[in-house]
Regions:
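Conserved alpha/beta-hydrolase catalytic His-Asp/Glu region
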Residues: 280-347
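Catalytic active-site module of serine/aspartate enzymes centered on a nucleophile-bearing elbow/loop
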Residues: 380-411
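Acidic catalytic loop of the alpha/beta-hydrolase fold
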Residues: 361-365
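Conserved HGGG/HGGXW glycine-rich cap/lid loop of the alpha/beta-hydrolase fold
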Residues: 142, 147-193
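Short beta-strand/loop motif that positions the catalytic acidic residue
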Residues: 350, 356-358
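Active-site loop/oxyanion-hole signature of alpha/beta-hydrolase fold enzymes
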Residues: 133, 139, 147, 185-229, ...
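Feature captures hydrophobic
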Residues: 1-134
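Flexible "cap/lid" loop of the alpha/beta hydrolase fold
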Residues: 239, 248-278
Length: 411
């Protein structure tokens, strides 16, 4: 794996046309970021733009005032690295920031949501509808952050991330599906930029919140796509509120463990509120865990891996972030597999068309679950990706999006 320094040097040493030097970057910054939107004016934030040899600029937003300073000032909320030509293209609206990130032409460190809100600062004349717009809404009494992309009249799809992740874990899917769908990607309560209620975060709670979210964004019903824990949430919505769901796509969904429950007694004794105690985690350790989720981590851009690790470390550094993580992880492990309220006992009651996708090298949700799903839901469509880990939407983005699109259009 390339070092972080090597990655940044690669991004910043790209060929730069003469017109895209320091003067062009600063002019683009002044022209665009000096005129923030009303929403951006409410934010208190600091962004650093690093354009290699062309220079570094700091943008401060505070109480409606925006200042642009040459150089780096203190600790930023986020840093954006790109060669000058790419940065100018993004600032002037010729290139979407998400597209540049997915293509490896732009690198983000720090708060991913803050960098995604860059579009709210720019107001390009011709905005790509695939570029996600950042919003906040109250759902179930929780301030909830979400991304939205695509045309308003298109078929709605809601994307639900996994444990410890955020809406950014679906960026490739957002960019692809929003060509012909209206796509929402949420930060579930307790994660990312959404508020972090100190309470049990189990599938039933998230299903109720999901219905409230659909109400808040005026969606009578939608297709739901969930990865890992998000898949479990999507299933619960389908079981409890089928009238709000068109179709379900479950990407390596977490489901009640049928075995390996030997630690259940101990886990019940450990209270998530212990997360109030500081528990620092190292970026390199998080990066190692993230890489283990992929069959071949080299398929995923190093920039995306580092951005995801940054996001986890940032959220987990807060007491509420740690408590939320422990609450959600505890609920996953302790869910009853059998009995009147058991997951596998209830699953046959799922009435909505469902597509399950498993990775044959996923150590978190082994493909052996496929047989249990087939027995409980004979009508479900089940696919196994060979040489794939736990996050197919990043390891095989084109294949995953194509499969979803075909499933949404099937009779």
């Amino acid at each position: 794996m390339a070092s972080l320094g090597a990655i940044l040097r690669g991004v910043l040493r790209r060929t730069t046309p003469p017109h895209a030097g320091a003067e062009a970057v600063e002019a683009a910054l002044r022209a665009r970021i000096a005129r923030p939107s009303d929403r951006a004016a409410l934010r208190k934030a600091r962004l650093v733009f690093h354009a290699g040899e062309a220079g570094v600029w700091t943008v401060d937003l505070r109480q409606g005032e925006v200042t642009l300073t040459r150089g780096r000032l203190g600790g930023p909320g986020a840093t954006i690295y790109a060669d000058p030509a790419t940065l100018v293209d993004v600032l002037e609206g010729r290139l979407a920031g998400v597209q540049a990130f997915l293509d490896g032409r732009l690198f983000m460190r720090g708060n991913i949501a803050l960098t995604l809100e860059l579009d709210d600062l720019l107001h390009p004349a011709a905005r790509d509808p695939r570029s996600p717009r950042c919003h906040r809404v109250s759902a179930g009494g929780v301030e909830s952050f979400y991304l939205e992309a695509g045309e308003r009249g298109a078929t709605p799809v809601v994307l639900l991330h996994g444990l410890g992740a955020t809406s950014a874990s679906f960026l490739p899917t957002i960019w692809d599906l929003s060509r012909d769908h209206r796509v929402f990607a949420v930060d579930l309560p307790g994660f990312g930029e959404s508020a972090k209620p100190v309470r049990p975060l189990h599938a039933a709670y998230y299903a109720r919140w999901m219905v409230d979210f659909l109400d808040a964004v005026a969606l009578p019903r939608a297709n739901l796509v969930g990865n890992s824990m998000g898949g479990r949430v999507a299933l619960e919505v389908g079981l409890r509120s089928p009238e709000r769901v068109d179709r379900l796509v479950l990407l390596c969904p977490s489901m009640a463990w049928r075995r390996y429950r030997f630690a259940a007694g101990l886990v019940r004794l450990l209270r998530p509120e212990l997360g109030v105690t500081p528990l620092p985690v190292l970026h390199r350790l998080v990066l190692g865990v993230l890489r283990s989720l992929f069959a071949r981590p080299e398929r995923v851009p190093d920039a995306a891996m580092n951005a995801a690790a940054d996001e986890f470390v940032r959220v987990f550094a807060t007491p509420r972030g740690r408590i939320a993580f422990f609450h959600a992880a505890r609920a996953i492990y302790l869910e009853d597999p059998h009995g009147a309220r058991g997951f596998w006992s209830r699953l046959p009651g799922l009435s909505r068309p469902s597509l399950f996708v498993f990775g044959d090298r996923d150590w978190l949700v082994p493909r052996a679950f496929l047989h249990h799903v087939g027995a409980a839901l004979p009508s479900a469509t089940c696919e196994t990706f060979s040489d794939c880990g736990h996050v197919p939407q990043f390891e095989f983005p084109e294949r995953t999006s194509a499969l979803m699109r075909a499933f949404f259009l099937s009779p």
